[in-house]
Amino acid sequence: ENLDSLSQKETEEYISAQKNANLGFVSDPLLKWDDIFRPFANLSGVTPTALNRIYEMNTFYRVLSFDGSAFTDGGNTVKSNLDSSLPKNKTVAIPEPFTFAELHTSNEFKRKEDFVINLAKMLRVEIDSLVESGFEVIQLLAPSIAYNKEVDFGVVSDALKIITDGLKAKTILHTYFGDVSTKIESLLNLPVS
C-alpha cells in the first residue's frame, strides 16, 4: 500500500472509532495536514518558507509568508483539506488569528495588530464556509495565548469578534503549551462560546 491509501484508511478508522464511541462531535484526525497551518500555504499570496520548531517542542511547522493584503480563496482552504466521510455532527480545529500572526510573517502588514485582524477576516470566510457545510463546533487553537507571557487581549478580542459575531456555530478557544492561570480573567472575557 502507498502512503496516501494508508493515511486514508487510518483517517476512516479514526472517524469510525469516534462514531462508535457515540461522541457528541466527530473530527477529522488531520493526518494529511503536516501542521495546523499547512493548508493555508495554498492561498494566493502566501509562500511557504522555512521549517520552525513550535514553542521549543520537537514539533515543526512551515512558516508562511503572507505577501499580499488579500489572502483568501473564497473559504474553501480548510474544507477542501478535510475528509468527506465526516458525519453530520462534525467539528473542526483551526488556528486562531493571534497565534497565526505570532508564528508567521507578512510583507504587507508591518504592525502585528493589522496582520491579526486581516487573518481574522480570512479565517471568518473559512469558518462561514465550514458552518454552511454543516460544522457545528469550531475549535480555535490558541497555543500562543498560553505560551506568551504577554498577550494583547484587546487585539485577541477584536479578532475573535470578527470570527464569532453572528456565527451560527459554537466556538471553543483551546489554549495549550503554557499555564494560563494568570490569564483566566482575560480569557473568560473573550467572545467565544
Predicted segments with their positions:
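Domain-level signal for soluble alpha/beta catalytic cores
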Residues: 1-193
